Amino acid sequence: MKLTCVLIVAVLFLTACQLIAADDSRDLKRFSRRKMRDGMLNTKNTKRQCLPPLSLCTMDDDECCDDCILFLCLVTS
């Protein structure tokens, strides 16, 4: 019985540690992979082909120059 209680407490403690140490995905929009790459490639000679607004995209699609929300490429101003 004591061993079971110790195991339950240990699992709860480790779960709490994982939740505390997990990355916060709310800041993903501020530091997205696309924006970081654009900052590194920001030269006058670099041209990107962008998808038009309201075209289908995926969440990791780099052809959507603006935001990809619900599989649609949206223009943010």
From Swiss-Prot:
Alphabetically ordered keywords of this record: Cleavage on pair of basic residues, Disulfide bond, Knottin, Neurotoxin, Pyrrolidone carboxylic acid, Secreted, Signal, Toxin
Subcellular location: Secreted
Taxonomic superkingdom: Eukaryota
Residues with Pyrrolidone carboxylic acid modification: Q49
Tissue: Expressed by the venom duct.
GO molecular function terms noted in the UniProt entry: ion channel inhibitor activity; toxin activity
Major localisation: secreted
Disulfide bonding pattern of the chain: C50-C65, C57-C68, C64-C73
Propeptide: 23-46
CC terms in the record's Gene Ontology section: extracellular region
Stretch forming the signal peptide: 1-22
Entry comment, domain topic: The presence of a 'disulfide through disulfide knot' structurally defines this protein as a knottin.
Protein family: Belongs to the conotoxin O1 superfamily.
Name of the protein in its database record: Conotoxin ArMKLT2-022
